[in-house]
Amino acid sequence: MYRSTLPKRARVLKRRQFLYISRAGSRCQGSQVIFHVAPSKYPGCCKLGITVSKKFGKANKRNYFKRIVREAFRLKRHSLPSCQIVVMPKNKHRPKFEELLQDFTQQIPEALNSKFSKNKSTIGGEYSPKNEQCESELP
């Protein structure tokens, strides 16, 4: 059984990481969200970053969006391939939790396979994290 928290090493935190993922990664659209997905250099490591602008709504609406995206990622991250994901809302409507779970399981593997199966090298420059390691968590 896995922990029911999302550790700090499973999050995208720095601006340069967000920029790398958006430039080097592939983009796919779910039913309510937009995913930017880039392969991870560390096997068994899946990271999540969330961006929500003020145009989406007031703070309570933005925080609700972030909470349900984090929870959907937490539930599905052990079944996802090694990747780095940035999630953005597609429109101003609150996404449904079930749709997010479905998007995480279907859209992200498709995005990784479509862009990176032909060309294994990263596109848009190299991101070299300093002292950043991601270990797969033990059950």
Swiss-Prot record:
Keywords for this protein: Endonuclease, Hydrolase, Nuclease, RNA-binding, tRNA processing
GO molecular function: 3'-tRNA processing endoribonuclease activity; ribonuclease P activity; tRNA binding
Pfam families: Ribonuclease_P
GO term, biological process aspect, one: tRNA 5'-leader removal
HAMAP family for the chain: RNase_P
Cross-referenced PANTHER family: RIBONUCLEASE P PROTEIN COMPONENT (PTHR33992:SF1)
Annotated spans, Disordered: 116-139
Entry similarity comment: Belongs to the RnpA family.
Gene Ontology cellular-component annotations: ribonuclease P complex
Broad EC category: hydrolase
Cysteine disulfide partners in this protein: none
Keyword Cell membrane appears in the UniProt entry: no
EC number assigned by the record: 3.1.26.5
Protein's name in the database: Ribonuclease P protein component
Protein's gene: rnpA
Subunit structure of this chain's protein: Consists of a catalytic RNA component (M1 or rnpB) and a protein subunit.
ATP-binding among keywords: no
Catalytic activity: Endonucleolytic cleavage of RNA, removing 5'-extranucleotides from tRNA precursor
Job description of the protein: RNaseP catalyzes the removal of the 5'-leader sequence from pre-tRNA to produce the mature 5'-terminus. It can also cleave other RNA substrates such as 4.5S RNA. The protein component plays an auxiliary but essential role in vivo by binding to the 5'-leader sequence and broadening the substrate specificity of the ribozyme.
